[in-house]
UniProtKB/Swiss-Prot annotation:
Changing K50A: Reduces DNA-binding by 70%. It is found in: Nucleus. Phosphorylated by pachytene checkpoint kinase IME2, but also phosphorylated in an IME2-independent manner. Phosphorylation probably eliminates SUM1-mediated repression and is also required for full transcriptional activation activity. Phosphorylation of the DNA-binding domain by IME2 does not alter DNA binding affinity. Keywords: Cell cycle, Cell division, DNA-binding, Meiosis, Nucleus, Phosphoprotein, Transcription, Transcription regulation. This is Meiosis-specific transcription factor NDT80. It comes from Saccharomyces cerevisiae (strain ATCC 204508 / S288c) (Baker's yeast). Residues 324-410 are annotated as: Disordered. Binds to DNA as a monomer. The gene is NDT80. The record marks R58, R111, R177, R208, R254, R326 as: Interaction with DNA. Residues 327-351, 386-401 have a biased composition (Polar residues).
Length: 627
């Protein structure tokens, strides 16, 4: 309480301001990433923070209406040749992509494309009358008025530095996304037309399909070869345009500011640029002397190889534009507060932030001085000075009883899902020490009340955290695998890697061997086939194992000599380095009951070797056999 009363009110105000700024930042983050605004023509534009959202270059979300244009001045009047009526001209430009309105400034990026479209209109003359008429420029030269015949009207764009009024180069790219070709935006011949809506420009921006292009053909082009020539005179303006397909809309797409502008340092004072749209008339250079300094003009190189003069009629420009030379992530908005504490502290201090004005209890300064993070951490950070470790594995929530039990159990490991042998031994050893009468078994119900003993739920061992002792499989010292047993005909062979000890009692494994031998016969695999005679009529069979054989089988040769009728047969399946031969012999009936000390006798055709071997019939060495 004394510490709360001695808290400095100035420090309290600082802490309150920090949390207020943090709260405003969180509210700012909760605002929609993409803001939709209604344009004057009824279409919509999508505005978003490029530091938060990355959009593909060809995405329609990149299209948004940019800064408005303002009139610079009118230069030279245009009159109709026969009537002398002055033509009322007006440029209608619009930026459809590339600029964002940030902090009351229009901001663009040097490496990003921008799209500018423009048309012009004649308020006192419709399109049909405009194309059938001819027009002249009124040029005053030394108080003498002269007229220059207009060949056609056109529009061009350029950029200027507002600080020193120098012209900045613009670069336009083709539709192919490669390094070239690059060229300066050209002069675009136009006829009067209304400006298409922003949505149409957005939809037609990346159209390359011929069928879809025909949909917008009437919007963007006037085809001279589709009109009736009889309605137009020889000196009409329609025939003076350079091409049959005359554009109605000047579309400057995929335009960038040239890399020569120096805007690489975000810390330096922002340079302002402006885009200019100029409507002009192309006239014959032989008739234009250029003596009037008040009328600007540019020389043109026409497609037919001749030259032309582009005389300025009207000019419009944008408000000052900030062109940034680096990516949006390098520029921080002045309205954005970056002070932020870790997300875990935010979640743990929610109640404190709501009651901050009353300052019921002092705040932990170490939490407030935490380093601001650029993004919210996905790992929950523990409270300061807390010794409890948080498991990275998500599990079900524990009840209060289970939580207290976990704290009491000295062997509880919340972040281990499988019991190890060492942990089992430690747990059983602890139970044995606490319950000496129970030996190595679970404690009785009377001993479970003892502090430190496991509850009933722990004795069963949850399958999600441990392994039940009853589920541990105890295997014999020697196991005979099924894969080492081969059944060929009426014989079953088992491959062993080494001989058992001479004192080893094979009867221990007799039952398991008999069960293993009762496996189905191996299909018709070619490597398991053997060629043998009609062994069903034979009483005895003997095998000779090569001395260099690395495989040992419990088989011995018969004591009787082989006859001339013995036919050797060879197994087609060879196990590693082992080779085997069997000899089928025909025996007389009187020899059927003869007892051989070390012979192998077949009782019936289906008898397995496991039913014939005796306990004492074992090899002493790998290469020593008794005959």
């Amino acid at each position: 309480m004394n510490e709360m009363e001695n808290t400095d009110p100035v420090l309290q105000d600082d802490l309150v301001s920090k949390y207020e700024r943090e709260l405003s930042t969180e509210q700012e983050e909760d605002t929609p990433v993409i803001l939709t605004q209604l344009n004057e023509d009824g279409t919509t534009s999508n505005y978003f923070d490029k530091r938060k959202l990355k959009i593909a270059p060809r995405s329609t979300l990149q299209f948004k209406v940019g800064p408005p244009f303002e009139l610079v001045r009118d230069y030279c009047p245009v009159v109709e040749s026969h009537t002398g009526r002055t033509l009322d001209l007006r440029i209608i430009p619009r930026i459809d992509r590339g600029f964002d309105h940030i902090d009351e400034e229009w901001v663009g990026y040097k490496r990003n494309y921008f799209t500018l479209v423009s048309t012009f209109e004649t308020a006192n003359c419709d399109l049909d009358t405009f194309l059938k008429s001819s027009f002249d420029l009124l040029v005053e030269d030394s108080s003498v008025e002269s007229r220059l015949r207009v060949q056609y009207f056109a529009i061009k764009i350029k950029a200027k530095n507002d600080d020193d009024d120098t012209e900045i180069n613009l670069v336009q790219h083709t539709a192919k996304r490669d390094k070239g070709p690059q060229f300066c935006p050209s002069v675009c011949p136009l006829v009067p037309s209304p400006l298409p809506k922003h949505q149409i420009i957005r939809e037609a921006s990346n159209v390359r399909n011929i069928t879809k292009m025909k949909k917008y053909d009437s919007t963007f082009y006037l085809h001279r070869d589709h009109v009736n020539y009889e309605e137009y005179g020889v000196d009409s303006l329609l025939f003076s345009y350079p091409e049959d397909s005359i554009q109605k809309v000047a579309r400057y797409e995929r335009v960038q500011f040239a890399s020569s502008i120096s805007v690489k340092k975000p810390s330096q004072q922002n340079k302002h640029f402006s885009l200019h749209v100029i409507l002009g008339a192309v006239v014959d250079p032989d008739t234009f002397h250029g003596e009037n300094p008040g009328i600007p003009y540019d020389e043109l190189a026409l497609k037919n190889g001749s030259k032309g003069m582009f005389v300025y009629l009207q000019e419009m420009k944008t408000p000052p534009l900030i062109i940034r030379g680096r990516s949006p992530s390098n520029y921080a908005s002045s309205q954005r507060i970056t002070v932020r504490t870790p997300s875990s502290v935010n979640s743990s201090q929610n109640s404190t932030k709501r009651k901050m004005p009353s300052m019921a209890q002092p705040l932990n300064e170490s939490c407030l001085n935490a380093r601001p993070s650029k993004r919210r951490s996905k790992v929950a950070l523990g409270a300061p000075n807390s010794g409890a470790s948080i498991s990275p594995i998500k599990s079900r929530q524990s009840t209060p009883m289970e939580a207290s039990k976990e704290n009491e159990d000295p062997f509880f490991r919340p972040n281990k899902r499988v019991e190890t042998l060492e942990h089992i031994q430690n747990k059983l050893g602890a139970l044995k020490n606490q319950c000496p009468d129970s030996s190595l078994k679970y404690p009785s119900s009377s001993s479970r009340g003892m502090e430190g003993c496991l509850e009933k739920e722990d004795l069963v061992y949850s399958s999600s955290f441990s392994v039940n002792m009853k589920q541990i499989e105890l295997k014999p010292a020697r196991s005979f695998e099924h894969e080492n047993i081969f059944k060929v005909g009426s014989l079953a062979f088992k491959k062993i890697n080494e001989l058992p000890h001479e004192n080893y009692d094979i009867t221990i494994e007799k039952k398991s061997m008999e069960q293993n031998y009762l496996r189905p016969e191996i299909g018709s695999r070619s490597e398991c086939k053997t060629s043998y005679g009609n062994e069903l009529s034979l009483s005895n069979i003997s095998f000779s194992i090569l001395p260099n054989s690395a495989e040992n089988f419990h088989l011995e040769t018969a004591l009787f000599p082989a006859t001339e009728e013995d036919v050797p047969r060879t197994f087609s399946r060879i196990l590693e380095t082992g080779s085997f031969q069997n000899y089928y012999q025909k025996m007389d009936a009187e020899n059927a009951d003869r007892v051989y000390s070390k012979g192998v006798k077949l009782i019936a055709s289906g008898t397995l070797p496991s039913g014939i071997f005796n306990r004492e019939e074992l090899f002493e060495e790998d290469s020593f056999y008794k005959y």
